[in-house]
């Protein structure tokens, strides 16, 4: 697998805003937390991006990235209730329905 890279300023902003860093994403991926890789839902605006779906502490995060020639460039980290439901809580009944 290619190495991961990111913008250090964006990494600091993520730590401050979400308490999560790109380093924690990489550790999760390397320890088996990669749940899926999907195309970015807005291919018209982000044609070269794909999205990692990564489990971190029993919650799914979406991590848009660009597949460069010699590395993967991580763009941001987005917590996702839908991805958590779809990838981590399959088959569990929803108490609200």
Segments (PLM) and residue ranges:
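Ribonuclease/tRNase effector modules and their secretory precursors
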Residues: 1-97
């Amino acid at each position: 697998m290619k190495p991961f890279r990111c913008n250090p300023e964006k990494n600091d902003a993520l730590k401050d805003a979400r308490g999560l860093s790109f380093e924690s994403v990489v550790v999760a991926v390397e320890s088996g937390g990669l749940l899926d890789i999907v195309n970015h839902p807005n291919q018209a605006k982000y044609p070269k991006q794909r999205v990692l779906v990564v489990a971190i502490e029993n919650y799914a995060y979406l991590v848009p990235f660009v597949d460069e020639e010699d590395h993967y460039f991580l763009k941001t980290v987005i917590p996702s209730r839908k991805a958590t439901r779809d990838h981590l809580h399959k088959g569990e009944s929803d108490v609200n329905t």
